[in-house]
Structures are given as C-alpha cells and as structure tokens.
Amino acid sequence: MAWHRNIKTRGAMVVAAVTLGASGVAAAQSMSTNSASFNAGYGRSSGQESRMVEYSTRDANGNRVVVDGVMLTGSDQSVFSSSRSSGSLDAYSGVGAVGGYAGSTAIGNNLTVITQGNNNTVIVNSSQVNSGNVTAGANVVKGGTPK
C-alpha cells in the first residue's frame, strides 16, 4: 500500500509543478530610477531645477490678446489665468439633461478677436448691459428617452 500512496503523491507533485510552471513567474515591482529623479519636478529633468519655467502668453505669431484684463492664449483663445471672469468672457451655451435632471444656459455675450500680423498686443475692454427678458427651457426626461 505504501507504493500506491507514493505514486499518488508523485502524481500530485507533477500536476502542481506543471500548474505553477504554466501560470508564469511572479514579478515584483521594480524601480528603474531612484527617488532623486523626483527632485526635478514634473516634466523636467535633473539639472533644470534652477532654470525658470518657460511659457508664453503669445501665439505662434507673437500676438497677445487681453480681454477685460485677462490674458487669452492659444489658438482657441482660452483663459490663461483668472480667478473670476467677467464681461465678454462670461459666455455659456448648451442644454443638457442627465438622470432626470436638466439645465439650460444662454449665451450672455460672445466676442471673437482675430489678430492679423506679428508681435501685436490687443487689449479689449468691454461691458454689457442685459436689460431684456431671458427665457430658457429644458425638457426633463427620465432614463434619457423623451416622452
């Protein structure tokens, strides 16, 4: 009987070895660098710590646009830095509904500045008075299907 148990044990060991071998090798996490690489900051490399950050408030042609005291950058003239937008920068549009809730907004003021030439600075100071009635509607639906 001892030989019978020995064959079963050997068979179980072979099955276990094949199963472990087929599952692959367990890999621990590894670091290709050390913690000193974090000293430079995001997007920078070692040796750049003392250099100033290079960013531009001008487009590819060297033009700068300032609307109501806020610098606009990029091809879409998005807000560069502002704690509060006002005047012509307060523009909203669209209607949306999600999960039985709905909201609607209307454009308060829409200003597009197109600058031709190179190395220009365009400053726009605007104000707007809204004295008329504004109406905006929304159709609230449940589950995303209008009835």
From Swiss-Prot:
<comment type="function">
    <text>Involved in attachment of the holdfast to the cell. The holdfast is a structure that allows the bacteria to firmly adheres to surfaces.</text>
</comment>
<dbReference type="InterPro" id="IPR049851">
    <property type="entry name" value="Holdfast_HfaA"/>
</dbReference>
<protein>
    <recommendedName>
        <fullName>Holdfast attachment protein A</fullName>
    </recommendedName>
</protein>
<dbReference type="GO" id="GO:0007155">
    <property type="term" value="P:cell adhesion"/>
</dbReference>
<keyword id="KW-0130">Cell adhesion</keyword>
